[in-house]
């Protein structure tokens, strides 16, 4: 009987997952699943409506700071895209000239840096795909390697960027500061970027590709008009960035991104980092002529706030409500018991949390759906089953947040039916109709995805993460499974 009650309590998760798999937006699926969770909690635990509302509101209160971060993040993304920060980053790299042997690795690095500035992998891919695919066409590079490289690079900033919605949401669900997340995984993320770049460069040179030089202007001029029109429909902001790249913006417009990174490295609060980016993009943009007036710049801020409030903030409020109700009735206890029956130590538990993220991503076919569905489960698995100091427990929550984000974003690149891949294929067919792309084209050459997903799981399980600065998990006996603690006490009593 206990099994069936536990399964019934967990059924709201199945409903949320099923609705999202069917294609329903999370903004609709989450409220429906939440109402169902209210009903289940009332039946199984005899909880009153007011009690459920109170626990739901209390859970959402913890996300208030996250909501402000999301608004500022969207505002900074708008300002960076419109004032020329993104275009300056692209031009700095492209004006050096490219060959068939370097187009893939340069595309990888440019999209990696640009995605940090814009906070969006989809927007970065849409903006850079026309440039690098037509550059690749001109110099005679390998189209599949270049495509997969910019796909992997575009995911870099979506996993570690201050203004990435997946970074902010995954951190909020685990109740960790975004800036702490970035600092804890920074060396690992940059290490993955460097290792992947080296591998891509080696692959390019092993293909015996030509060494003729081309530039971005030629590539953009080569893009057919109908392609630009199709891209405007798919991602209008990408067309604006392409035009800025073609017309040129001063190189110093990249300084706002540098300032944001420097402030972040200093460890200042996330809101201050984002504010520095917004203000500096206005000041430098005014000097460069990319900002027409204070009024027009404030319109960008308004657009950013509106974008955050129209979906992601409302979605997170419902997800927070859902998580509060599920926790109130101990809905995750059966899953916790199943995982704990297999985990022999904290590292194995954390490794299984990573596997849960991958499984959720594959099942839901959406990285944000995985983050909001699996995130509360992995958080409760740690909080209910691990003992340690507040500092050590915080480090475990940081890894859970990194799992949710990294295995959501990079994991998506290895799942053929994922919405990420579907979006990429749509962009590719629009901007480069000379090749018929399929999902495996992106997957088999996506070096960054393989390196990131494989390394974080292996490092977590083996304990080799201790060799990466700030990335190591606390070891036993500093953190211990509660069941192991009980077993040790029982053994001492017997002795």
PLM features per residue range, with description:
Residues 71-73, 99-131, 340-383, 404:
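Hydrophobic alpha-helical transmembrane segments of multi-pass integral membrane proteins
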Residues 1-78, 82-102, 238-247, 255-318, ...:
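Hydrophobic transmembrane alpha-helices of multi-pass solute/ion transporters
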Residues 123-134, 164-176, 335, 368-382, ...:
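Re-entrant/interfacial helical elements at transmembrane boundaries that shape
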Residues 18-23, 109-121, 152-158, 262-267, ...:
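Transmembrane alpha-helix interface/packing and boundary motifs in multi-pass membrane proteins
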Residues 22, 159-160, 171-237, 370, ...:
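Juxtamembrane and boundary regions of transmembrane helices in multi-pass small-molecule transporters
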Residues 45, 61-62, 140-144, 169-182, ...:
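Juxtamembrane helix-boundary/capping and inter-helix hinge elements in multi-pass membrane proteins
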Residues 101-113, 140-159, 348-361, 387-417, ...:
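Alpha-helical transmembrane segments of multi-pass membrane proteins
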Residues 125-132, 150, 273-283, 354:
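Central hydrophobic cores of alpha-helical transmembrane segments
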């Amino acid at each position: 009987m206990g099994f069936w009650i536990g399964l019934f309590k967990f059924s709201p998760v199945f409903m949320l997952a099923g609705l999202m798999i069917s294609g329903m937006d999370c903004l609709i699926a989450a409220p429906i699943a939440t109402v169902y969770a209210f009903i289940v909690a009332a039946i199984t635990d005899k909880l009153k409506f007011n009690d459920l509302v109170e626990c739901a509101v209390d859970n959402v209160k913890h996300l208030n700071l996250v909501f402000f971060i999301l608004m500022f993040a969207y505002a900074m993304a708008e300002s960076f895209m419109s004032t020329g920060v993104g275009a300056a980053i692209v031009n700095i790299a492209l004006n050096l000239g490219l060959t068939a042997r370097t187009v893939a690795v340069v595309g990888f690095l440019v999209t990696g840096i640009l995605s940090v500035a814009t906070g969006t992998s989809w927007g970065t891919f849409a903006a850079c795909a026309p440039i690098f695919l037509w550059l690749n066409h001109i110099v005679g590079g390998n189209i599949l390697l270049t495509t997969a490289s910019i796909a992997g690079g575009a995911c870099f900033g979506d996993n570690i960027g201050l203004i990435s919605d997946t970074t902010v949401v995954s951190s909020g669900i685990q109740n960790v500061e975004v800036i702490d997340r970035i600092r804890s995984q920074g060396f690992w993320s940059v290490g993955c970027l460097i290792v992947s770049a080296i591998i891509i460069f080696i692959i390019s040179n092993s293909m015996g590709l030509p060494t003729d030089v081309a530039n971005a202007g030629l590539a953009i001029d080569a893009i057919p008009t109908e392609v630009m029109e199709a891209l405007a429909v798919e991602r209008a902001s990408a067309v604006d960035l392409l035009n800025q790249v073609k017309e040129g913006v001063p190189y110093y417009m990249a300084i706002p991104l540098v300032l944001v990174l420097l402030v972040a490295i200093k460890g200042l609060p996330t809101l201050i980092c984002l504010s520095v980016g917004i203000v500096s993009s206005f000041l430098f943009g005014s000097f460069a002529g990319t900002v027409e007036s204070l009024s027009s710049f404030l319109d960008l801020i308004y657009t950013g706030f509106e974008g955050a409030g129209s979906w992601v903030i409302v979605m997170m409020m419902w997800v927070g409500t859902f998580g509060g109700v599920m926790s109130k009735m101990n809905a995750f206890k059966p899953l916790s018991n199943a995982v704990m029956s297999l985990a022999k130590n904290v590292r194995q538990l954390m490794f299984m949390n990573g596997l849960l993220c991958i499984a959720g991503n594959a099942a839901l076919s959406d990285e944000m759906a995985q983050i909001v569905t699996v995130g509360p489960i992995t958080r409760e698995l740690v909080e209910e089953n691990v003992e340690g100091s507040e500092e050590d427990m915080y480090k475990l929550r940081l890894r859970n947040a990194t799992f949710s984000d990294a295995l959501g974003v990079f994991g998506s690149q290895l799942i053929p039916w994922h919405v990420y891949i579907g979006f990429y294929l749509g962009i590719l067919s629009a901007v480069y109709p000379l090749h018929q792309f399929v999902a495996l084209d992106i997957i088999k050459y996506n070096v960054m995805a393989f390196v990131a997903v494989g390394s974080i799981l292996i490092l977590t399980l083996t304990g080799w993460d201790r060799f990466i600065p700030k990335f190591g998990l606390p070891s036993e006996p500093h953190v211990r499974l509660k069941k192991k603690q009980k077993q040790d006490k029982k053994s001492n009593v017997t002795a």
